[in-house]
Swiss-Prot record:
Name of this chain's protein: Ribonuclease HII
Species of the source: Rhizobium meliloti (strain 1021) (Ensifer meliloti)
A Pfam family this chain is assigned to: RNase_HII
Gene Ontology MF terms: manganese ion binding; RNA binding; RNA-DNA hybrid ribonuclease activity
SUPFAM superfamilies (UniProt xref): Ribonuclease H-like
InterPro entries attached to this UniProt entry: RNase_HII (IPR022898), RNase_HII/HIII (IPR001352), RNase_HII/HIII_dom (IPR024567), RNaseH-like_sf (IPR012337), RNaseH_sf (IPR036397)
Length: 216
């Protein structure tokens, strides 16, 4: 009797990992407390700042539903943003498009994260950072965590704060630069945004070091 071949992949897709408090607990066991999470929003857009946030969660008041901001709806992000601000220690910093053009997007992002961490009213003993790079010049210990916004609740909270803050900034910028539709795409390279750039040229919020502006 022949055996049925096992499928190469599971019958049901695996769920995306949900961030938890594992990294924070490990840091606490190692003697590092408080623990902050840090993340940024806006590395990829053609326009606007990159915004970083640092968050120290209250272990007794962690908002339900924390996750990578990219996996949440705008309504979910807004609700969690308000809850995070009400229950946590939060600091926000940004690097402008001019700063991005003067240095580069990675340096500008890391500098914004450093300033966000240093702006916390409660000094962190260690900061968990999303990605592979740790901001230079931190006054505390740091640990880089790849895909940290889907693994650590502190980083997930920071990703939400950074994303909502930046989206609100770009919505306000739409009133000053109404030709580009910043309220709809937040500066990302959508077809509508590229068409507006072709029609009207770049504005002062555009990152001239990014394509397609290098030849403009």
């Amino acid at each position: 009797m022949s055996r049925r071949k096992q499928p190469d992949s599971p019958l049901f897709p695996l769920q995306a990992p949900v961030p938890d408090f594992t990294f924070e607990r490990a840091a606490h066991r190692d003697g590092f407390w408080p623990v902050a999470g840090a993340d940024e929003a806006g590395r990829g857009p053609l326009a606007g700042p990159v915004v970083a946030a640092a968050v120290i969660l209250d272990p007794d008041a962690i908002p339900a539903g924390l996750n990578d901001s990219k996996l949440l709806t705008a309504e979910q992000r807004e609700a969690l943003f308000e809850e995070i601000l009400a229950t946590s220690t939060v600091s926000i910093a940004s690097s402008s498009s001019a700063r991005i053009d003067t240095t580069d997007i990675l340096k500008a992002s890391l500098d914004a994260m450093r300033r966000a961490v240093h702006g916390l009213e409660l000094a962190a003993r260690i900061v968990l950072v999303d990605g592979r790079d740790v901001p230079p010049g931190l006054s505390c210990h740091a640990k880089a965590i790849v895909k940290g916004d889907s693994r650590s609740v502190s980083i997930a909270a920071a990703s939400i704060v950074a994303k909502v803050t930046r989206d609100r900034m770009m919505a306000r910028a739409d009133a000053t630069f109404p030709l580009y539709g910043f309220a709809h795409h937040a500066g990302y390279a959508t077809v509508k945004h590229r068409t507006a750039i072709e029609s009207h040229g770049p504005c002062s919020l555009h990152r001239m070091s990014f394509r397609p502006f290098r030849q403009v």
